[in-house]
């Protein structure tokens, strides 16, 4: 009678106008998903591909963040943050932790820890000794050399120990400053004296005043028995013998404060005058022997020579001149003369060629002195460039405006080592464009971002992806490029085997692009199937210029470790001087990829693959019996260990194998087959 009335359940209708457009399933035989939307499929494919690497010694240094209280394990801070931190230091190894270092370990030490380099290269390759900053160099037995002229200090010691000889620093700095030749360094003697006096007069635990001049002195190693000059950066301390007891807490705290100050405020380096002496190998000292360098000629200038090029960047870009990319004037390029710009083409307004002597970015150096003799080594960076300074420099080369007002319908279609790629539509024309978005704060080497803009803007070719515009949007660099709907060559070679006509067609297009770029002095340094894009009608274009470098008559060689491990040339891995020949080797690896479906040693770890590429004979095809003799000969011309014997792009264009080149339409069935496999069950 008084029963509660049941609520009437709402009726839910079936979907109206429903269309089942996407059907995704899992193929157990292939072990992968099929029918995924393109943007999902591209993300999965990208995650499985090896990422490019850059020289760890060239990683962009960033501004120090405010200190935070850190508690490791059960150790509690005692007498404030500094004392607690010093208490934790006793539990850490200097080798295993970089937390308290002003700089990262040398690239050689990191490479040895990965098994990347053998000890034999230290004595045989003197140029490798010049790849790291002066304050980080070690003797052949791995002992850090302190700045008092070479006294070894063991790894178990604290870096940058307490000064013990107060009078050495001013005298050494004064003598060094007085020897400076270029006009812009007159007065450096007084600055160095002020800096030395400031560092010495500070009581234990007190930081030097921030008004001190922030330029230090560094010099490169010269001659097999020449001195390692003193450095304003790290003082003139003499290292304690490894067997001595630990310093007192007060001494440790004072030393740490000094190190923190130097890492924050004294990370800049001045330069020394040029010298005609030739760099030699490091001294062969014993682990416990003292190093007493004789006083000889002045070290070579660390200022960049007149009109010389950055170590890893195109001509005129805002990038460092580093000792790892020093040139050898005796070795000339075998390609066409490489100049800073296209013949007959004037530098565009606002281009890096116009501004390169005025703007500084990450790891930039002092303006180049036209009076410095050719052949002088490039120097250390003048200091940490702030994020705002870098943005201001980048703003000089990009287009003005906000692309968000011009674009809509963003869809993420890929992700790379420097950023993400989205597909967008232009509002005014309806044209689809690819937008590469790169966060400036998340770059290993942010100065390489200039390559994305400058090279693609200044060097246009039928077989190079066209760049429309570039913008600075907040903290990101946006590069608008043409969208190639055929996708990357990787998608095809991992699914389908190409015949020789199709391989020849791809190689001919890539070689046309490389011949053009090499004639302009541009090294791509990341040739692989991921960098080759296709249109729906079968045209082939080269993309991904984020790791390229520019060479010229002044700097005809490079030396940085840049590229993707499985495609790297042996001379890149061994840190030898190299030029455009490295792209030819990488193209040869890509040919193996098109025949076998993957590059050589792909089942090995990247480090192991790099070892084998460096030390073993050139890799061979797994399915060599399936290819013609002319293709094998074409491949052997590219995979030659000696760069001087390796064929150039122009020579390969005349090879008989490329007579099999077909029309772009011969690649269309491959594109259609891949699209069909990824869109249906």
From Swiss-Prot:
- Write down which residues bear the modification named Phosphoserine: 560
Identify the residues that the record assigns to the Protein kinase domain, covering every copy. Answer: 407-658
Q: Name one Pfam family in it.
A: PBD
Which residue intervals are annotated with compositional bias (Low complexity) in the record? 201-212, 268-278
Q: What is its main location?
A: cytoplasm
Which keywords describe this protein according to UniProt? ATP-binding, Cytoplasm, Kinase, Nucleotide-binding, Nucleus, Phosphoprotein, Serine/threonine-protein kinase, Transferase
Could you tell me where the Polar residues compositional bias lies?
A: 308-333
PTM section of the record: Autophosphorylated. Phosphorylated by MAP2K6//MAPKK6, leading to PAK6 activation.
Q: Which reaction does it catalyse?
A: L-seryl-[protein] + ATP = O-phospho-L-seryl-[protein] + ADP + H(+); L-threonyl-[protein] + ATP = O-phospho-L-threonyl-[protein] + ADP + H(+)
Q: Per the record, which residues fall in region Linker? A: 26-406
Every copy of the CRIB domain together lies at 12-25
Location of the protein in the cell: Cytoplasm; Nucleus
Top enzyme class, one word, equals: transferase
Gene3D superfamilies reported in the protein's UniProt record:
CRIB domain, Phosphorylase Kinase, domain 1, Transferase(Phosphotransferase) domain 1
GO cellular component terms attached to this protein's record: cell junction; cytoplasm; cytosol; fibrillar center; nucleoplasm; postsynaptic density
Impact of changing residue 566 to F on the protein?
Complete loss of PAK6 activation by MAP2K6/MAPKK6
> Which EC number applies?
2.7.11.1
What tissues contain this protein? Answer: Selectively expressed in brain and testis, with lower levels in multiple tissues including prostate and breast.
Its domain of life reads: Eukaryota
Q: Where is this region: Disordered?
A: 1-30, 149-169, 200-256, 268-355
Query: Its GO biological process terms?
Result: apoptotic process; cellular response to starvation; cytoskeleton organization; intracellular signal transduction; learning; locomotory behavior; memory; neuron projection arborization
Concerning its family, UniProt says:
Belongs to the protein kinase superfamily. STE Ser/Thr protein kinase family. STE20 subfamily.
Q: What is the recorded function of this protein according to its Swiss-Prot or TrEMBL entry?
A: Serine/threonine protein kinase that plays a role in the regulation of gene transcription. The kinase activity is induced by various effectors including AR or MAP2K6/MAPKK6. Phosphorylates the DNA-binding domain of androgen receptor/AR and thereby inhibits AR-mediated transcription. Also inhibits ESR1-mediated transcription. May play a role in cytoskeleton regulation by interacting with IQGAP1. May protect cells from apoptosis through phosphorylation of BAD.
Listed under subunit, the entry gives:
Interacts tightly with GTP-bound but not GDP-bound CDC42/p21 and RAC1. Interacts with the androgen receptor AR and the estrogen receptor ESR1. Interacts with IQGAP1 and PPM1B.
The identity of this protein, by name, is Serine/threonine-protein kinase PAK 6
Q: Which organism is it from?
A: Homo sapiens (Human)
